[in-house]
Amino acid sequence: MKLIIEENADKVAEFAARYVVTKINEATENGKYLVLGLPTGSTPLGMYKKLIEFYNAGVISFEKVKTFNMDEYVDLPRDHTESYHSFMFDNFFRHIDINPANIHILDGNTSDHEKECEEYERKIKESGGIDLFVGGIGPDGHIAFNEPGSSLASRTRIKTLNEDTIQANARFFGGDITKVPTQALTVGVQTVMDAREVMILITGSHKALALHQAIECGISHMCTVSAMQMHRCATFIADEDATLELKVKTVKYFKGLMNHHRSLVMF
């Protein structure tokens, strides 16, 4: 496991975007597609903006990229401004040269949620598995919609959202919790664990306790991202504020490796 510590959220976004570009170019040079798992929410927005900048500068093409998003609300119209389908197209897909046929987002409006989730897992497998799964975490350490108490062996399924998550997401619905969907389709913890690499973005002091629990405490279903401790190639990228709850020696150790880590994303 690696922990990358950057000064602020902008530098977290820069490092993450450069890493994604590096992986895409490596795959393309070998005549392969790169399969990406992608998140929504406020944390990855900076990364998407940087990736668009790299695309506009001619540094990267997304023609050889396939994507699978982490989650989608149930019974929220696809064209709703707060659907994750709208989020991804408004903030990323519409601005790059990705083939729409290579974009995969769960359909929360299907009449058969179980079948949709099974098909999603099948499509991931047919694509050769996810090469790099990018994710964010909630203040309670949840990844995707795998909230506290979720099975660490879980796969894509329908989840009922807890009150904390609904309240946290109310800001996207004008502060009205009655407008927030109460269920979502989400990849499972094991779905993420199956990826060849996982990259978790954490910014802000409100995520500091979650980062501490994720990397300095034991693995627990009450902090689902802690399962990444068992992943063969997991990287956490955090800003200084997100490290406030970490031990001094933990921060010192990983900062001592930063020159090496930065050399991996130089282009």
UniProtKB/Swiss-Prot annotation:
Highest taxon listed in the record's lineage: Eukaryota
PROSITE patterns the record matches: GLC_GALNAC_ISOMERASE (PS01161)
EC number(s) recorded for this UniProt protein: 3.5.99.6
Matches recorded under SUPFAM superfamilies: NagB/RpiA/CoA transferase-like (SSF100950)
Localization per Swiss-Prot or TrEMBL: Cytoplasm
Pfam families: Glucosamine_iso (PF01182)
Pathway noted in the entry: Nucleotide-sugar biosynthesis; UDP-N-acetyl-alpha-D-glucosamine biosynthesis; alpha-D-glucosamine 6-phosphate from D-fructose 6-phosphate: step 1/1
Reactions listed under catalytic activity: alpha-D-glucosamine 6-phosphate + H2O = beta-D-fructose 6-phosphate + NH4(+)
GO cellular component: a single term: cytoplasm
Residue positions of the active site: D71, D140, H142, E147
Keyword annotations of the record: Carbohydrate metabolism, Cytoplasm, Hydrolase
Protein's GO biological process: carbohydrate metabolic process; glucosamine catabolic process; N-acetylglucosamine catabolic process; N-acetylneuraminate catabolic process
One term of GO molecular function: glucosamine-6-phosphate deaminase activity
Enzymatic class: hydrolase
Subunit and interaction comment: Homohexamer.
HAMAP family per the UniProt record, alphabetical: GlcN6P_deamin
Record function comment: Catalyzes the reversible conversion of alpha-D-glucosamine 6-phosphate (GlcN-6P) into beta-D-fructose 6-phosphate (Fru-6P) and ammonium ion, a regulatory reaction step in de novo uridine diphosphate-N-acetyl-alpha-D-glucosamine (UDP-GlcNAc) biosynthesis via hexosamine pathway.
Family: Belongs to the glucosamine/galactosamine-6-phosphate isomerase family.
Record-given protein name: Glucosamine-6-phosphate deaminase
Source organism: Caenorhabditis elegans
The organism's taxonomic lineage, starting at the top: Eukaryota, Metazoa, Ecdysozoa, Nematoda, Chromadorea
